[in-house]
From Swiss-Prot:
Gene3D superfamilies: Aldolase class I. Belongs to the thiamine-phosphate synthase family. The keyword Transferase applies. Binds 1 Mg(2+) ion per subunit. The gene is thiE. NCBIfam families: thiE. It comes from Pseudomonas fluorescens (strain ATCC BAA-477 / NRRL B-23932 / Pf-5). This is Thiamine-phosphate synthase. Condenses 4-methyl-5-(beta-hydroxyethyl)thiazole monophosphate (THZ-P) and 2-methyl-4-amino-5-hydroxymethyl pyrimidine pyrophosphate (HMP-PP) to form thiamine monophosphate (TMP).
Length: 207
């Protein structure tokens, strides 16, 4: 599977009361990867929601990624995204197998991405590129970093942080393979608008 296009990331607070409706609306518009991001300690609910999302993703031929929880990912047969504080990538690869998608947060540091690539990452994520409500304190990344990463890395590059339809095009033009979007996708007034935004993000890769 080619990892290129929209990478939708859920936010339990933003999607309160409309979680599945908006997620399915995004999938309708086209999502390459869907990340389930929930930082709560309610393990039973997280398992239930992850299994529901997995079934939705299978229907739309999308791959599900679990944020920061390799054990949950292994339990349901999903991929995982690991932050820099979540430990080395190698144990997750051993747990999930060779075919699983494993992503790694690399902030704005190319050496972190090069290390993740050596450890078997499926993709690396840089950001934040713009002001972000999800990660307000994250170090800023630049288009120059993206150019350097594109020249030295031979795996998909994901970009994250305040990405909207108004600012995403330069990121794609500088080599981003995956646009990771939270509020720029799900902060819409209606499910129909979520679908429209998803289609518009994907169109940036074909222009």
């Amino acid at each position: 599977m080619k990892l290129r296009g929209l990478y939708a990331i859920t936010d339990s607070q933003l999607l309160a009361g409309k979680f599945l409706k908006y997620v399915e609306a995004a999938l309708e518009g086209g999502v390459t990867l869907l990340q389930y991001r929930d930082k709560s300690d309610d393990q039973a609910r997280r398992l239930r929601e992850a299994e529901t999302l997995l079934a939705l993703c299978e229907r739309y031929k999308t791959r599900l990624i679990i944020n920061d929880d390799a054990e949950l990912a292994a339990r349901i047969g999903a991929g995982v995204h690991l932050g820099q504080t979540d430990g080395p990538l190698t144990p997750a690869r051993a747990l999930l197998g060779r075919q699983a998608i494993i992503g790694a947060t690399c902030h704005s540091q190319l050496p972190l991405a090069e290390q993740a690539a050596k450890e078997g990452a499926s993709y690396v994520a840089f950001g934040r590129f713009f002001n972000s409500t999800t990660k307000p304190g994250a170090p800023a990344a630049s288009l120059e970093l993206l150019d350097q990463a594109r020249a030295s890395l031979h795996l998909p590059i994901c970009v994250i942080g305040g990405i909207t339809l108004d600012n995403a095009a330069p990121l794609v033009n500088h080599g981003a393979d995956l646009l990771a979007v939270v509020h720029g996708l799900f902060g819409a007034e209606s499910a129909e608008e979520v679908t429209r935004r998803a289609r518009a993000f994907n169109a940036l890769f074909n222009s």
